[in-house]
């Protein structure tokens, strides 16, 4: 998608890069990769929109996530995360996410806070963003 065609407020998420071996050392953070859809959640005032990593509006497809984001106590933010359906065994279930039947509710596993109350946080250290994210979600 051309940048000029991106929706207002959309932030292009960072993409993982495959390596032969994971990095090691105290400066690295490792995240679990779930069977999920990558989602950018953008709230601006009362309006909440969910986007796929390719900037497709998924708000209507994931209403529980949009409703939950609307209840957070912030006037604006952009979250990066993964929409998942957790099965009865506690594991993410990608097929349930794809079909989302009447009993399958998608939830967001948020792992980064890119913008918060009109401030771009992407240049801040990841640890700081994660601390702010935890505060927003609590």
Predicted region positions:
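Catalytic cores of nucleic-acid ligases and guanylyltransferases
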Residues: 1-138
């Amino acid at each position: 998608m051309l940048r000029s065609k991106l929706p207002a407020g959309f932030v292009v998420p960072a993409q993982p890069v495959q390596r032969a071996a994971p990095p090691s050392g105290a400066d690295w953070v490792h995240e679990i990769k779930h069977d999920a859809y990558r989602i950018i959640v953008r709230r601006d005032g009362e309006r909440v929109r969910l986007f796929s990593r390719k900037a497709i509006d998924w708000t209507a497809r994931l209403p529980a996530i949009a409703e939950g984001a609307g209840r957070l106590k912030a006037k604006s933010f952009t979250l990066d995360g993964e929409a998942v359906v957790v099965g009865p065994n506690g594991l993410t279930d990608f097929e349930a996410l794809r079909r989302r039947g009447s009993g399958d509710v998608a939830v967001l596993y948020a792992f980064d806070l890119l913008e918060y109350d009109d401030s771009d946080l992407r240049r801040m250290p990841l640890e700081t963003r994660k601390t702010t994210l935890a505060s927003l979600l609590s």
